[in-house]
Design a protein with these regions (language model features):
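Short glycine-centered helix-capping/turn motifs at secondary-structure transition points
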Residues: 18, 78, 106, 213, ...
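N-terminal secretory signal peptides
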Residues: 1-27
Length: 408
């Protein structure tokens, strides 16, 4: 097992010079909203964001996690250029708060965000964000200390677990699992005997915090679960894709003004991402090496960690109980760009039952059906799916609906 300092050192990488994480950013986002964060500029786009909406160059912001794989592969393989777009080198940031800030301020005009974040941005902060496609499915898990004795979610009673962001699929799925197990999630102070204390922690800090005993577990996107398993003595408790079948996690977002002003630009960007996702499905290990430290260096993580994070979903996990729904035929991470309305509706409903810091009053009375229509602009991905026959059933409208499945 690596020492906590060694785990942190994995993130000492040249790209950190572009990391604008600030400790108070998350609090500003949660308590004051985007208007407060951007200097009280009201609900209008900042000048920089307006400039981004007028910029033909694709400017990608991303967290160095496997959630960003499709965007990174589209860049690495030249799919944006082949679609007729100019693209800048993708910019990595260290935390969700930094990515939200960069997108809101106009530093990026294309990004991946955890699906609950654009819900919060659009309906709490009135920020004109639109979802263009899903970035991937599954791709997350909850890990605990290998010698913790924690065998299920009931075992998290009295424990402390880190989540990457209050408005995240991780927080939604974790709190669902805790409630189903009779454990009460709390977000302030220590956990009581029948409670699990949740705290925000940037993904790069999670494995080291677990190794140091500062937390009892964490739920996050890959490759931090794989890193925890390989370097921090962690054990996979459960994959999120084994709780919510093929759930969305990150989605591809753009500014509504960019889409309105340049619909052809949006369509070409989605074409590139759909092509990239098809490539990822067919070339999992190659893609893992490509985005790793030994490849293009999009992720400052060794190839063995990224390969495990994208391909290791086998019998050992069934034996340990991390996989309990083998019949779902899921993958550790998978790629499917269509934004099923049923999933958006369920996310909005689940957010209403999820404890977060700050004012979540905007969720009261928020109609899930309206959100599914208003937040998502699916015309581009619908056209892209039909343009690329690699996607089975893409030409059949019946394949564009599904029933959501949750089971602990």
């Amino acid at each position: 097992m690596s020492a906590p300092d060694d785990l942190s050192a994995l993130w000492t990488h040249e790209w950190t010079r572009a990391d604008w994480t600030r400790r108070n950013t998350l609090d500003a986002l949660a308590r004051g909203g985007l208007a407060a964060l951007l200097g009280g500029g009201g609900l209008a786009l900042s000048g920089r964001a307006v400039h981004a909406a007028e910029d033909d160059t694709v400017r990608i912001g991303y967290l160095p996690i496997t959630d960003a794989t499709a965007l990174l592969v589209a860049h690495a393989k030249g799919f944006f250029e082949e679609a007729g777009l100019k693209v800048a080198e993708p910019t990595p940031v260290r935390s969700w708060s930094a990515l939200v800030e960069g997108f809101a301020a106009g530093k990026f005009n294309l990004a991946h965000l955890l699906k609950p974040i654009p819900v919060w941005m659009r309906y709490n902060n009135k920020f004109p964000v639109k979802v263009l496609a899903w970035a991937h499915t599954n791709g997350s898990g909850i890990v605990v200390g290998g010698k913790s004795g924690i065998e299920d979610f009931k075992g998290l009673a009295g424990k402390r677990v880190a989540v990457p962001y209050w408005y995240s699929m991780h927080n939604v799925v974790l709190q669902y699992a805790l409630r189903e197990s009779g454990v009460v999630p709390v977000i302030r102070g220590d956990a009581g005997p029948n409670e699990c204390a949740l705290q925000i922690l940037a993904p790069p800090e999670m494995p080291a915090a677990l190794a140091a005993g500062k937390i009892d577990g964490y739920i996050v996107a890959e490759p931090f679960n794989a890193l925890g398993e390989l370097r921090a003595g962690a054990r996979m408790l459960r994959f999120t894709g084994d709780i919510w079948k093929n759930h969305p996690c990150c989605v591809v977002v753009a500014h509504e003004s960019q889409i309105a002003a340049r619909p052809e630009w949006a369509g070409k960007a989605v074409d590139a991402i759909v092509r990239a996702q098809a490539y990822c499905v067919k070339n999992r290990e190659e893609v893992a090496r490509l985005i790793s430290k030994e490849g293009r260096g999009y992720l400052p993580m060794p190839a063995d960690v990224v390969i495990k994070a994208t391909t290791d979903y086998g019998p050992a996990y069934e034996a340990s109980g991390a996989i309990r729904h083998r019949d779902w035929a899921a993958q550790r991470i998978d790629f499917q760009p269509w934004p099923y309305p049923s999933a958006t509706k369920l996310i909005v409903e689940a957010m209403g039952n999820t404890v977060v810091e700050g004012d979540a009053g905007f969720l009261k009375g928020l109609d899930p059906d309206f959100v599914a229509r208003d937040l998502v602009d699916d015309r581009f991905v619908r056209a892209s799916l039909r343009r690329y026959p690699e996607w089975p059933g893409a030409a059949d409208d019946a394949a564009l609906t599904r029933q959501e499945t949750l089971s602990l």
